Swiss-Prot record:
It is found in: Cytoplasm. This is Cell division protein SepF. One of its GO terms (biological process) is FtsZ-dependent cytokinesis. The keyword Cytoplasm applies. Belongs to the SepF family. Pfam families: SepF (PF04472). One of its GO terms (cellular component) is cytoplasm. It comes from the Bacteria. InterPro entries: Cell_div_SepF (IPR023052), Cell_div_SepF/SepF-rel (IPR007561), SepF-like_sf (IPR038594). Keywords: Cell cycle, Cell division, Cytoplasm, Septation.
């Protein structure tokens, strides 16, 4: 077996070599075209505007709301929880409800407030304030009312 036969057996044929050489040359010319810098054009940039340190009050005004509610039945507790989920503080007056229904609502809202990371505080007889995590309650006013409630429920 001659060396040329071995060479053609293991290496490319002359036609393949020519095709490879042609594709190599074509790649080289394409790369040169890509590497040529484009013509320089004059670009004008607008002058930078000074940064304004003004914050819209409307944004802050819309994000903080307090909802006043006076539910009559336990079935309204889910609507109150929806207000809390919407990041709105809620003041609930439970004086027009039976005590057992009011206790159930406070229990439900306590769980809701815990789940969203908020707070619930008593602000008067059968009146509570529930707040989401974006609202802080500072101070206490329950001392002004004293212990004049006539309910038998110790935790209220």
């Amino acid at each position: 077996m001659s060396w040329s036969k071995v060479k053609y057996f293991f290496f490319d044929t002359p036609e393949e070599k020519e095709a490879a050489q042609y594709s190599y040359e074509k790649e080289q010319t394409d790369m040169k075209k890509q590497q040529d810098p484009p013509e320089q054009q004059d670009v004008t940039f607008p002058k930078a505007q000074p940064k304004q340190n003004v914050v819209s009050i409307e944004t802050a005004k819309q994000s903080s709301k307090v909802v006043l509610l006076e539910p009559r039945t336990y079935s309204e507790a889910q609507g109150i929880a929806d207000h809390l989920k919407g990041r709105r503080a809620v003041v609930i007056n439970l004086q027009r409800m039976s005590t057992d229904q009011a206790v159930r609502i406070v229990d439900f809202l306590s769980g809701t407030v815990y789940a969203i990371g908020g707070d619930i505080q008593k602000i008067g007889p059968k009146t509570f304030m529930c707040t989401p995590e974006n609202v802080d309650i500072v101070g206490a006013i329950s001392e002004l009312f004293g212990e004049e409630e006539d309910t038998n429920i110790k935790r209220w």
